[in-house]
Amino acid sequence: MQSIFIPLSFFVVIVYTFRIYNRNPLILALGSLFFIEMIWQFISIIWIDCGAYISEQLRYSYYTGASIRYTLLIMPFACLFPYLLDRNLKRKKITTVRLKLGSDKGISKQILYILCLLAIGYLLTNVLISGAIPLFSHINYSRFYDQYSVLPFARIIYDYFLPFISVILGGMAGEARKNNKETKIYFIAMGMILVLQLLLNCKFYGLYDYILQFVLGFFVFQYDLSKHTKFKLPIKAILIGLLGVGILLYISYTKYSYSEINPFQYLLDRVFALQYHTFWGIDKLHHEGLFTSDTIGFVNEILSGFLSLDISRLNPDYGIARVMYMVSAGTYARDMLSSGYLFAGSYLTVILSYVGYLFAFISSFILAFIVSKLCANLYGSILTKNYFAAFVYFYILKRYYEFFRVGNFAMILNWKFLVLYLFLFLMYIVSLRSNRNSGKGGF
């Protein structure tokens, strides 16, 4: 089954990506984190539903139709998000705006670059003098900042500012793309961020997302929509390539299938089944009639960020940590949580674990609307060099991505975010009043 359905899933992903690119490539740049996560989840659930080994349940999975149900649940987001973002970009008329970083109205590009370098150097120094570099000490970055961080405010800079710094560096590199010497210094600074991430033992998350954030900033200033060229999808070449992939999977899994010493099978199961095993587990409970709706628990989940000033993602009463106990065998979940690790999941998994498919389906519509607004406003703020507004939008967007990826409501509903939401509402009111005479919309 995997040798048939995985190539088919690749084909769907390629066609979907091409259609978005031909509509507006900026959509891919602004929503890259969400698209990659969604595509990985899509391929993962198909791989699992075709019979992957799930270590949390200590067994091979079997077909339950979970892949079909996931596709239906994510469909509103997959279809609406690109459409709404494209509409928002055109409505604001910001896709053709071209302004330069470091204008006379704001902070100069040189000073901004120096501040970015100082922040990166500060974080690198903190890791190097700590005496416990995570890469060589086998500890995660969270534990490092809790127990081994030396310099003050290092964690605040790392958690709140470093991701945005990667966007700013990308924007600078994009604007200076015709000056190779100047462009190199921004790429060097970005390279320092990646070195920091490696030292912090962030070998996957923390590498590709920072690279995509840099690309986002670069693309904002590098791309000119008026010169956009649409590409024709090479159907024959894609089908031939996917046929080869299917044959390779078939040979590999018929020759080496279910061998305890087969590294190829282990690698594929870890790559493809790493992401969405929790959804398969929760869906199986529904499928077997073992699920009991917990509406009160769902309300508490939504309010979890307001019940405590600093609620932990590892709290077994909420979010994906709660799901871990529902889908894992024995004490596996407890052992993972005690080590500081979460299973992979998403907002669909968490909502499905409380109130079922209907609310999960509706949530995809809501999330598509909110994320498209955030992406469009972030793009406009970066392009007009309103760094404060851009930072606020980017921070909120990152948290929505974490919610999209992990599913804990406390990530987007808490006291800190309540202040940010009120701030954005005030910005919107001010923008409406200032643009009323000119006939423009709000920010």
Residue ranges and their predicted role:
Residues 340-443:
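Hydrophobic alpha-helical segments
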Residues 1-99, 187-194, 210-254, 389, ...:
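N-terminal "leader" segments that precede or initiate the main folded domain
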Residues 57-61, 87-231, 244-257, 403, ...:
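Membrane-embedded catalytic interface detector for glycan/lipid assembly enzymes
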Residues 9-14, 165-170, 189-197, 345-349, ...:
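Hydrophobic, membrane-inserted alpha-helices
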Residues 143-152, 246-367:
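Small-residue-enriched transmembrane helix-hairpin modules in multi-pass membrane proteins
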Residues 22-27, 172-185, 377-390:
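Membrane-interface helix-loop-helix junctions at transmembrane boundaries of multi-pass membrane enzymes
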Residues 2-11, 68-78, 112-124, 149-166, 281-292, 353, ...:
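Hydrophobic alpha-helical transmembrane segments
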